[in-house]
Amino acid sequence: MPRRKILVLAKLNNKRFMHFRHFITELGKHADVVIWDKDRWEIGRILRILKGRKFSPDFIFCYDFAYNYALAPRVYGLGSINIPKGVYYIDLQTQTEERKKYVRENKIDLVFSPTKDFFHRTLPELKDKFRWLPFSNNPDIFKDWHLKKDIDFLLMGRSWSAWYPFRNLVLKKMTGLKGFVYHKHPYEGNPEGRKVYIGEEYAKEINRAKIFFTCGTKFNYPVRKYFEVPACNTLLIAKGNKDLKELGFINGQNFVECTDDNFYDLAMY
């Protein structure tokens, strides 16, 4: 079978795109992939340019347009072509109505998302187009770095009480406890000049921990940390959600499921 040709509409130069860049690199081993990141172009013009380069896509993969197209280019006229098209949606809690409109107006055939239960709860109208594409790790980064386990308890990332109530609870309960370390999200601002953990440094910091706490936000879905932490050979203590069983997470075997009431006792045990 000839290799498929996939046109990806995404702004890969964004720092937050590290995971997706790694995904595209892996995809490129199985298909011919071209990235388009220029804003405000007509799809017909793009296709003519690519045809001149002897590339005619079999499929167009559109990255999430949310946050004012911060991660994807504005491309016009997608609904006027008959090439199969898919869109990848991540933060489903934002711009929900716009997401439905985008699929409808651009005649999107498939909608990919890393969450299943949350997708069905949030965008039930699109369930027939839904394809589950869970988060994945680059094994060259998220692995056992064989570092000394000198952090007893680690919490990383955002901890706003409105969006991350469990992380906020952990932070309040564990702050001041010997062996507990908390690092803010790298994009929350850094006026104090603290060390920022991204890529390998992030994975290595996880690898130093014996126990890592996280949750799936107030919306209860598996964020990337559910995949990154076990890959770094660190015990994950986390809130459960409906996607985990299908993803292969087994309480007591490859992670420890907790509640607001028992996470501290489980960690101490």
Where do the protein language model's features map onto the residues?
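Small/polar loops that bind or transfer phosphate-bearing groups
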Residues: 214, 258-259
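Nucleotide-sugar donor-binding catalytic core of glycosyltransferases
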Residues: 2-55, 62-80, 84-251
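C-terminal "capping" alpha-helix adjacent to the active site of nucleotide-linked donor transferases
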Residues: 259-269
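A short acidic/histidine/glycine-rich donor-binding loop in glycosyltransferase catalytic cores
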Residues: 252-258
